[in-house]
Amino acid sequence: MLFLPADTGHPTGVAAASGPHVRSPVARAVRAMEPRCPPPCGCCERLVLNVAGLRFETRARTLGRFPDTLLGDPVRRSRFYDGARREYFFDRHRPSFDAVLYYYQSGGRLRRPAHVPLDVFLEEVSFYGLGAAALARLREDEGCAVPPERPLPRRAFARQLWLLFEFPESSQAARVLAVVSVLVILVSIVVFCLETLPDFRDDRDDPGLAPVAAATGPFLARLNGSSPMPGAPPRQPFNDPFFVVETLCICWFSFELLVRLVACPSKAVFFKNVMNLIDFVAILPYFVALGTELARQRGVGQPAMSLAILRVIRLVRVFRIFKLSRHSKGLQILGQTLRASMRELGLLIFFLFIGVVLFSSAVYFAEVDRVDTHFTSIPESFWWAVVTMTTVGYGDMAPVTVGGKIVGSLCAIAGVLTISLPVPVIVSNFSYFYHRETEGEEAGMYSHVDTQPCGTLEGKANGGLVDSEVPELLPPLWPPAGKHMVTEV
């Protein structure tokens, strides 16, 4: 019979007509599908599996249900046969083998024992070669991210460029380029903010501010090309220091985007990537603004239309901050959390919309008799309802009647309850993605397929294996640092 550890949670043993696993419907269905053969038969032979001193016993036909695995293939498992003891010996993790054997007995149900760490169990599953499908199901059940396959270009030069600009962890030069890219992004954002200061702002694009400039000080006298200081030459747009810095940043962004576009393995996949679209949007405002400025200097186009375009384009420049998400795991986790919580966020907005309509209507009718009321209509009350339900409370609009104050109190309480309902789900999603990312980093997992070759094996004469007997195991789960590769396309 089979010797089991006392704390095991999986039914294991001989595939006979007794035992707890036979009473389960799954086990009976699996046994009903097995072919009946008269004894003596090799498939009914009992096999003894010794795992680090703990002996398991099962039938050969039980292991034969999965012939592509290490235990299911008689040729591959024969390498571990001990003729003197008439058993198969595996110097592996004993608590994990209980679940591995149950995988064969149950017809493909793989469950990690509660007392076995995930990384240890994944390594055992890889050793016994249970297959990529079983490993993917296990990762999904455990909440692990399935590493996607990241293709590489075929040409060697394009492959080096792609690794240099797309994978900062691939080499020291790639890390330096990533640092330079982050610094350029930060400089661009700082310039975008500083050029809106009154001391640096050039308002000559807006003729409507000319009277204000004459009355408020010299810094607004830049309008229509006039000098901010008496006697100083008119300020030209292309001589502006902010324009020069912005041009240098755009040159770097354009160079980076162009190199990645040329070296990418698939143009279609490249343009479907959201981060690449953000990179394109980050440089588009500069060229539109430059073309508008040149057209205005040549007298082409309407000034009002040019001014409207410039204002919209300048607003789009703020999206450059999302370029940092390419180099920030925290921003990526935040994006994954928001994407996974779209349903909860939609419910939150829907609940707030209902509350805003109800309480704005109630406070309007409660304050309608007041002559000096701020709640002149229900749409005017929307703003008050929003800031009250979100517990902001600016105080620019406040009820003064008893009924209005009661409505305001109920609105604040309802807002707290409404906002607090979906928050635990969003926090749970963030915790899930955060721990998944940190656990992947601690385990040394990479987001691409490893192709590290196997070590040199000794010959059969020394008790080893020849190359043809190497088991077709899954790729290593935790490749050594500096040895990660990706699949070529």
Swiss-Prot record:
Motif (Selectivity filter): 391-396
Main location: membrane
Membrane topology: Multi-pass membrane protein
Tissue: Detected in heart, skeletal muscle, brain, and pancreatic islet cells.
Disulphide-bridged cysteine pairs: none
Subunit structure: Heterotetramer of potassium channel proteins.
Family of the protein in this entry: Belongs to the potassium channel family. A (Shaker) (TC 1.A.1.2) subfamily. Kv1.7/KCNA7 sub-subfamily.
Free-text note on domains in this protein's UniProt record: The N-terminus may be important in determining the rate of inactivation of the channel while the tail may play a role in modulation of channel activity and/or targeting of the channel to specific subcellular compartments.
Designated name of the protein: Potassium voltage-gated channel subfamily A member 7
Gene name linked to the record: Kcna7
